């Protein structure tokens, strides 16, 4: 069971982070990053690190909530969630941009944020497992892809040039911006709170240990590559001819829906058709044939009756009546 959890979690973390890089809908891009983080959680449980899984679950909600709140203000103000229709909002919506960066830093393995400590514990757990040569690169690669996905979303919304959808984008009401900025402050203070509560160790930064440098390097690689690709003229915002098939495959969730329809749905549909055919041909056919045979037998019986039995019964009845009447009259 633990091996299955590790396999499912590792595959989910890696595949979901890859799919997120090909999404143009901001909500889908973030939802796959959520799936990737929960893949880390499954890996921690499968490796026997329940405390590590608890730390991953503890440091995740606030940064992700901050990211979603910042993106929500953008979607309300621009009436679009298509990343290709946004851009150039840093000069118009800097507060929400800072809030998004704060939430993204809280999820990345970037010291001194809480996500760095939790992912460092997971990497240490992978190094102590029975297959460190496989699990350690998987964690580092998934972290790189998550960082690249977050920077990609930021670059396509706040970087680049303005579009017709983002040309007139003003800051939202304080009823939305104030809670977002307060949550940003809470995310910044989250590692301090966890150190104060004894959840994380201060050595000298929260979560700093033997696996700190490889984890930090994977984060910087993801940030640097994604910023170089998307903060410029955004060449990857549209499919590249040489990578069009790969991008389309990832954008359609690796054709998971088509595979599901061709396997599970096809089997269920075949079984339902077989059940309908058997009910129509076997059950309804048997009952219909039995009823038809009974009606045909009754019809043939009515045609073969000659009328003699009816006359015999009438004669017998009349005889009984006459006998009864004679007995009544003959009685003194």
Where do the language-model regions lie?
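Hard-cation-handling environments
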Residues: 169-223
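Aromatic-capped, Gly/Pro-kinked transmembrane alpha-helices
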Residues: 203-207, 236-332
């Amino acid at each position: 069971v633990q091996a299955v959890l590790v396999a499912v979690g590792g595959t989910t973390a890696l595949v979901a982070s890859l799919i997120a890089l090909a999404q143009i809908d901001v909500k889908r891009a973030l939802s796959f990053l959520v799936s990737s983080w929960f893949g880390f959680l499954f890996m921690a449980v499968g490796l026997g690190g329940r405390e590590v899984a608890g730390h991953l679950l503890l440091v995740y909600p606030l940064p992700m909530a901050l990211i979603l709140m910042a993106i929500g203000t953008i979607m309300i103000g621009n009436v679009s969630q298509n990343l290709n229709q946004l851009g150039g909002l840093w000069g118009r919506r800097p507060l929400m941009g800072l809030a998004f960066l704060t939430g993204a830093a809280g999820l990345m393995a970037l010291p001194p944020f809480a996500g760095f400590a939790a992912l460092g514990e997971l990497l240490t757990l992978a190094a102590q497992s029975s297959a460190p040569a496989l699990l350690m690169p998987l964690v580092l690669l998934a972290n790189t892809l998550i960082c690249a996905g977050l920077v990609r979303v930021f670059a396509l919304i706040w970087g680049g040039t303005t579009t017709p959808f983002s040309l007139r984008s003003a800051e939202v009401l304080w009823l939305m911006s104030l809670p977002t900025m307060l949550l940003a402050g809470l995310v910044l203070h989250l590692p301090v709170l966890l150190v104060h509560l004894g959840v994380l160790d201060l050595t000298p930064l929260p979560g700093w240990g033997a696996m700190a440098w490889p984890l930090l390097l994977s984060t910087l690689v993801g940030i640097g590559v994604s910023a170089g690709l998307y903060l410029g003229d955004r060449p990857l915002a549209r499919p590249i001819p040489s990578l069009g098939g790969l991008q389309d495959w990832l954008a359609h969730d690796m054709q998971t829906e088509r595979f599901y329809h061709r396997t599970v749905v096809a089997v269920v549909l075949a079984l339902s058709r077989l059940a309908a055919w058997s009910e129509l041909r076997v059950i309804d056919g048997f009952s219909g044939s039995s009823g038809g045979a009974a009606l045909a037998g009754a019809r043939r019986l009515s045609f073969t009756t000659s009328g003699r039995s009816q006359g015999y019964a009438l004669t017998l009845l009349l005889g009984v009546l006459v006998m009864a009447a004679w007995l009544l009259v003959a009685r003194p």
